[in-house]
Amino acid sequence: MNTPTVSTYSQAPSDVVRAANGIDVAYRRVGKRGDTPLVLANYFAANMDDWDPLIVDGLAADRDVITFDYTGIGSSGGVTPATVAEVAVDCVGFLHALGLTTVDFLGFSVGGMVAQQIASSHPEMFRRMILCGTGPRGGEKMTFTELSIDELNDPVALLLNSFFTPSGASQAAGHAYLDRLNRRAADRDTPVAMTAAAAQLRAIREWGEVPTAGRYAMLSTIRQPTLIVHGANDIVVDSVNAMILEENLCDARLLMLPDASHGAQSQHADIFLANARLFLNS
């Protein structure tokens, strides 16, 4: 029997669970308990407040949705790891601390890198996986040398310029997205520290380094059904990486969204939610 919980993400209370490694992980939970939970893993230098309420509420309409802060990010304790593999280990520890053995997992940007790592190293943990705006280890144009934590000093400009294209329609969607992020009036998350963002930047740069052999070998070990969602004009993670994921994963389908950059799922929320819910309910 599904147990009703909080119905909107903007009102979801923050909670903390202590993982086996002693780290206190901050999380929020919204939707109906009962079936396989959907866990959302966020992008670079983002905390729980940076999830689009429109997306979370749409996904939580008929399922249990969980967001969380990575180690050392936002309200979570510990020191932010400097590799994606270490982040993945901590995420698995968080899931175990909640008593979860199998989940659906949506990874956005950095979260998609973490998702691939967990799907490969702990395949029993994931039933289905959604990868938004991300790329494979050693992907094309994924050195992230153009990224700087100094850009975080102007988050509005950063989001409008990197998550949305210059078109009028995309920029309008960007401003609507920013308005939605400000809906939460109380119990806001702790801002991300620059030291934590710097460690996270080292992690994604390490992920983007091209290995000396077997560039996409890890993808062949991932067998969970996967939905790949990408903006056709993504300037953060080039869209060619979505096609590489589709070609190398064992069971993948690609949703490429037009006139969209890194925040494609928020710009085309209706299309994204329809496809994501159909995929998760399959």
Sequence positions of predicted segments:
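Hydrophobic, aromatic-rich cap/lid helix
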Residues: 13, 188-215
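Conserved HGGG/HGGXW glycine-rich cap/lid loop of the alpha/beta-hydrolase fold
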Residues: 20-77
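Gly/Ala-rich beta-loop-alpha elbow adjacent to hydrolase catalytic centers
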Residues: 107, 111, 115
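Short beta-strand/loop motif that positions the catalytic acidic residue
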Residues: 222, 228-230
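Catalytic active-site module of serine/aspartate enzymes centered on a nucleophile-bearing elbow/loop
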Residues: 251-282
